[in-house]
């Protein structure tokens, strides 16, 4: 959906400054107003907008194409998730990265923001799990993949996507290990604690909620 860069910048600026004015609740009215004025008048807190025109990334094959070619597992057809469209063409760098990863090559992906870096490692990981499922080895215990993020917010965002993707993949277990991961040894208790924090989230049978489970 197109956005107006100036209106969006003004909205972000006003929201951010409003937040800053509330983080220091001075009891004295004079200090409170002086702090608010300093926040509003500063030209160091918000810059921009800084606009950049970027050409669209070149597209190539879809996941469906790679499945039919034999590069990826046929199990991808069963995902049926808008988070990983089966028939939508992927970017060239995504297809190249997937091919290299599936063939056992190491790689580094450097590309622009919003250009689908996640798919370059997530698709090969899912393919590896699906291949194990096909070979009957997925039930054997062990961690197959670890996704490392520098901040909880990034880990939480990825977790939301994984929950949507793997909701119907009952044989694939997954979990999130961060500071707030439940320390309980009891799964039911861990789920209750999870629901207190995320009351709207659906509980998945293949999700691991406690540190002991993970």
Where are these regions (language model features)?
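Short hydrophobic/aromatic beta-strand immediately N-terminal to the Walker A/P-loop
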Residues: 107-110, 146-147
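Conserved Walker A/P-loop ATP-binding site and its immediately adjacent core
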Residues: 119, 141-167, 176-185
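Conserved catalytic network of the ASCE P-loop NTPase/AAA+ motor domain
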Residues: 134-141, 167-170, 207-209
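The conserved Walker
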Residues: 111-115, 151
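Helicase-associated low-complexity/disordered flanking segments
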Residues: 1-96, 168, 172-175, 191-198
């Amino acid at each position: 959906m197109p956005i107006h860069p100036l209106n969006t910048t003004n909205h972000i600026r006003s929201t951010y400054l409003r937040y800053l004015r509330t983080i220091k609740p001075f009891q004295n009215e004079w200090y409170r107003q002086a702090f608010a004025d300093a926040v509003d008048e500063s030209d160091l807190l918000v810059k921009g907008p800084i606009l950049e025109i970027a050409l669209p990334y070149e597209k190539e094959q879809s996941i469906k194409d790679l499945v039919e070619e034999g590069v990826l597992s046929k199990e991808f057809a069963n995902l049926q998730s808008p988070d990983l469209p089966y028939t939508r063409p992927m970017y060239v760098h995504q297809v190249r990265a997937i091919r290299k990863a599936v063939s056992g090559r190491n790689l580094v992906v450097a590309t622009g923001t919003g250009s689908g870096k996640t798919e370059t490692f997530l698709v090969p990981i899912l393919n590896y799990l699906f291949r194990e499922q096909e070979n009957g080895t997925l039930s054997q215990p062990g961690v197959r993949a670890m996704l490392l993020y520098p901040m909880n917010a990034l880990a939480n965002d990825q977790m939301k996507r994984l929950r949507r993707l793997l909701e119907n993949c009952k044989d694939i277990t997954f979990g999130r290990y961060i500071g707030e991961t439940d320390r309980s040894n009891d799964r039911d208790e861990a789920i209750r604690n999870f629901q207190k924090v995320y009351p709207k989230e659906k509980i998945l049978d293949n999700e691991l909620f406690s540190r002991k489970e993970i």
